[in-house]
């Protein structure tokens, strides 16, 4: 199954190409990318009902909307800081359930495969991984907050 990063790369490649439509099917998962008239890519994905984790549909939004991130985002200027961004529009959850503790907090050590949060989109819960080894420096969003595509969620000091 494709992960969020691979889907994002496909969207970018299709958006920059002359291809109008792309369809991917594998193991019961169907992904359809189709350009609208304005040249933006629309993503439609149908996931199987059995798995708990599934990729949610996502729409590519203009880069200008990324600037709409909250003013609380004041990243420390350090070349080793990596931003973990939201791969989709949805609701940010710091833990797997209301009773559970957060996946990570400031000071938590993470590796590339560490789940740092969940972003819910259309009743599908998508686990977001750190994708870098290091230490969480700052959590930039609140639990239950609506997040935009590309919005920074965490700052990680990369090792």
From Swiss-Prot:
Protein's UniProt keywords contain Isomerase: no
GO-annotated cellular components: acetyl-CoA carboxylase complex
Residue ranges crossing the lipid bilayer per the database entry: none
Sequence ranges of Low complexity compositional bias: 53-74
Pathway: Lipid metabolism; fatty acid biosynthesis
Stored CDD domains: biotinyl_domain (cd06850)
Domain Biotinyl-binding: 81-157
InterPro entries attached to this UniProt entry: AcCoA_biotinCC (IPR001249), Biotin_BS (IPR001882), Biotin_Carboxyl_Carrier/Decarb (IPR050709), Biotin_lipoyl (IPR000089), Single_hybrid_motif (IPR011053)
Keywords, comma-separated and alphabetical: Biotin, Fatty acid biosynthesis, Fatty acid metabolism, Lipid biosynthesis, Lipid metabolism
GO biological process: one example: fatty acid biosynthetic process
Superkingdom classification of source: Bacteria
Signal peptide: none
GO molecular function: acetyl-CoA carboxylase activity
Residues recorded with modification N6-biotinyllysine: 123
Primary role: This protein is a component of the acetyl coenzyme A carboxylase complex; first, biotin carboxylase catalyzes the carboxylation of the carrier protein and then the transcarboxylase transfers the carboxyl group to form malonyl-CoA. Binds biotin.
Subunit comment: Homodimer.
The name this protein goes by in its record: Biotin carboxyl carrier protein of acetyl-CoA carboxylase
Species, as recorded: Bacillus subtilis (strain 168)
High-level lineage: Bacteria, Bacillati, Bacillota, Bacilli, Bacillales
């Amino acid at each position: 199954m494709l992960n969020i990063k691979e889907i994002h790369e496909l969207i970018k490649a299709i958006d920059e190409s002359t291809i109008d439509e792309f369809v991917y099917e594998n193991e019961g998962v169907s992904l359809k990318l189709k350009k609208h008239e304005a040249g933006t890519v629309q993503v439609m994905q149908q996931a199987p009902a059995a798995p708990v984790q599934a990729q949610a549909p996502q729409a590519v939004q203009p880069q200008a909307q990324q600037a709409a991130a909250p003013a609380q985002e004041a990243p420390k200027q350090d070349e080793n800081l990596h931003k973990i961004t939201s791969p989709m529009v949805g609701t940010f959850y710091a833990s797997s359930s209301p009773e559970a503790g957060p996946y990570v907090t400031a000071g938590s050590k993470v590796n590339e495969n560490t789940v740092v949060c969940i972003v819910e989109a259309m009743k599908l819960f998508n686990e977001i991984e750190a994708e870098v080894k290091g230490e969480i420096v700052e959590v930039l969003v609140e639990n239950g907050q609506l997040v935009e595509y590309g919005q920074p969620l965490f700052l990680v000091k990369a090792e």
